[in-house]
Amino acid sequence: MFNIRNTQPSVSMQAIAGAAAPEASPEEIVWEKIQVFFPQENYEEAQQCLAELCHPARGMLPDHISSQFARLKALTFPAWEENIQCNRDGINQFCILDAGSKEILSITLDDAGNYTVNCQGYSEAHDFIMDTEPGEECTEFAEGASGTSLRPATTVSQKAAEYDAVWSKWERDAPAGESPGRAAVVQEMRDCLNNGNPVLNVGASGLTTLPDRLPPHITTLVIPDNNLTSLPELPEGLRELEVSGNLQLTSLPSLPQGLQKLWAYNNWLASLPTLPPGLGDLAVSNNQLTSLPEMPPALRELRVSGNNLTSLPALPSGLQKLWAYNNRLTSLPEMSPGLQELDVSHNQLTRLPQSLTGLSSAARVYLDGNPLSVRTLQALRDIIGHSGIRIHFDMAGPSVPREARALHLAVADWLTSAREGEAAQADRWQAFGLEDNAAAFSLVLDRLRETENFKKDAGFKAQISSWLTQLAEDAALRAKTFAMATEATSTCEDRVTHALHQMNNVQLVHNAEKGEYDNNLQGLVSTGREMFRLATLEQIAREKAGTLALVDDVEVYLAFQNKLKESLELTSVTSEMRFFDVSGVTVSDLQAAELQVKTAENSGFSKWILQWGPLHSVLERKVPERFNALREKQISDYEDTYRKLYDEVLKSSGLVDDTDAERTIGVSAMDSAKKEFLDGLRALVDEVLGSYLTARWRLN
């Protein structure tokens, strides 16, 4: 049986590849880029999938890794499924592409058990290890928390037949259609019992029940995505229980006193049993809970989002993370100074506890989507001052349900009237109204009519009309846009405006990739320049938001985009916003940002565009022989560099057969080959694009 363990490389990856660990974790970096791919109700599960994939826990099986990636893909809107790529170039190779089709995460699991996570130039390595040699009989069960054997092998021998009888009967009693799943689980339990593996993962096997007796020695039990209505008595030595995606599971049995981790999200739980005193990690999001039991003193992480809670119990002093968004909370209990992350967005909070101001400077607080007044927020800003606490909010206020109009009616308000004898342009949108997320897009169109742009910009209606015309002709772009609309129906005008900007950006990239600029290279470069400017502005906005104690990220981003629209020639950006005054962005910030973007573009755009996916697509169509020759050379360069590093680094250091060192030089060889590819591409791009790449801005 394979397990995963974290490893310390014998040769430092940073020393060979020159990579430094990012300030944010890989899953945080990736989530920021792909959040728009998912419906909001799937946010937490998608984030948990990412965390497990980036930091696999001991005991996770290769099949479970593959299923987690497939699950992540299934959680997206259909239009973004292709950005989550499974089994790419091999059996166990995966990657995630951002909205611009740029790779932001890759995960490789090879036959030797090497598990590598690559994210934005940083790599993290893990190993699969064999707990017992093939054919070797395990002489004792897994160690308990104290390091002692929970049960000797002689007891196993005496009890094995008894357990097998229970499991065999359970397998024979399977209802129609459930026999294959039960057979697989019985085999897994037998292997678990015979080999002493402490981890039992029953997988998504379509189970309606589990046998009355489980392997007694297990310390980790994983039961994902089945049809269970109840659980049997749990083994006394259980330390971790993960039971998720069982939508008929309404309650849990008594929990073992030594349980340290309980993940029971995406079920139908109406209540929780008494929690063990040593429980440190509790995740019960997306259930039907209306109240919580007393919290154990050892609790460090609490996730209760997506329930029907109106209040929370007293929180333990050691709590570090609390996620309780998407509930009905009207108040919060006192907060411990050690709390590092608090997310209570999308509740009904009208006031906040005084203890919130006593959190450490490293704390992050999310209050988005609560009916907090501007006066309350301003008072909070004055209180926290320069404490370093970062509080995120938005100007949306409480969510008010709003019924979507038929899509063709919402579209008709933006299109010009048909001439006599012509069919109304909006008529063809009746069929589009049956497509996924069409109702959300209808709401977006109606929300846009309430924005400052609609009220003050005479050309805004014509811009939207032109956009709708292309959407009507392009099913692929329409699907992506409709999917993005589900996150754009906020009651905050500026959030809808920001979402429109994101949709416009996707439109620009989509047009470039499908060939619109194959015969208009100047237009291709202009689109690339706009993407570069927006990316640079986003980084500037992120840095500015990081300096603000009370921050609405969207207002900060939108402030830079709107106010610099003309000076930076941003065609995808609108000219108006409502809440600039609460953004925290000053005139001097805007002046500095304009200069920073123009300077960066003059010096760095010609290098940046070499890695831009739409440019590669154009070159592959216009000069396929030369472009593909560069790709083939990249593969050859990788192989040559790997062999050279193997001889010069591994052999000379005595590290032959060291899998961590081999993986490290592999990353280094890949980076070297990519650099050679880009160097070769530069000459081709200079030849094809010519003067279009000269410095755009004249600076004093």
From Swiss-Prot:
Which residues form the LRR repeats?
Answer: 217-238, 239-257, 258-279, 280-297, 298-319, 320-337, 338-360, 361-381
Claim: ATP-binding is one of the keywords in the record: no
Stimuli inducing this protein: Transcription is maximal in the late logarithmic phase of growth. Expression levels are similar in the intracellular and extracellular environments.
Please list where the region (E3 ubiquitin-protein ligase catalytic domain) is annotated: 404-700
Quote the PTM field. Answer: Ubiquitinated in the presence of host E1 ubiquitin-activating enzyme, E2 ubiquitin-conjugating enzyme and ubiquitin.
Q: How is its activity regulated?
A: Exists in an autoinhibited state in the absence of substrate protein, due to interactions of the leucine-rich repeat domain with the catalytic domain. Is activated upon binding to a substrate protein.
Which SUPFAM superfamilies does the record match to this protein? Answer: L domain-like
What name does this protein carry?
E3 ubiquitin-protein ligase SspH1
Organism for this UniProt entry: Salmonella typhimurium (strain 14028s / SGSC 2262)
Ligase: is it a keyword of this entry? no
Entry's EC annotation:
2.3.2.27
Query: Which residue intervals make up region (Linker)?
Result: 396-403
The record's subunit annotation is: Interacts (via leucine-rich repeat region) with host PKN1 (via the second REM repeat).
> What GO molecular function terms would the record report?
ubiquitin-protein transferase activity
User: Which example biological process does GO assign this protein?
Assistant: protein secretion by the type III secretion system
Comment, domains:
The LRR (leucine-rich repeat) domain mediates interaction with host PKN1 and inhibition of NF-kappa-B-dependent gene expression.
Question: Which PANTHER family does the entry mention?
Answer: OLIGODENDROCYTE-MYELIN GLYCOPROTEIN, PTHR47114
Instruction: Name the catalysed reactions.
Output: S-ubiquitinyl-[E2 ubiquitin-conjugating enzyme]-L-cysteine + [acceptor protein]-L-lysine = [E2 ubiquitin-conjugating enzyme]-L-cysteine + N(6)-ubiquitinyl-[acceptor protein]-L-lysine
The UniProt function text for this chain reads: Effector proteins function to alter host cell physiology and promote bacterial survival in host tissues. This protein is an E3 ubiquitin-protein ligase that interferes with the host's ubiquitination pathway and targets host proteins for proteasomal degradation. Can ubiquitinate ubiquitin, giving rise to polyubiquitin chains (in vitro). Polyubiquitinates host PKN1, leading to its proteasomal degradation. Down-modulates production of host pro-inflammatory cytokines by inhibiting NF-kappa-B-dependent gene expression; this depends only partially on its E3 ubiquitin-protein ligase activity.
Q: Where is the active site?
A: 492 (glycyl thioester intermediate)
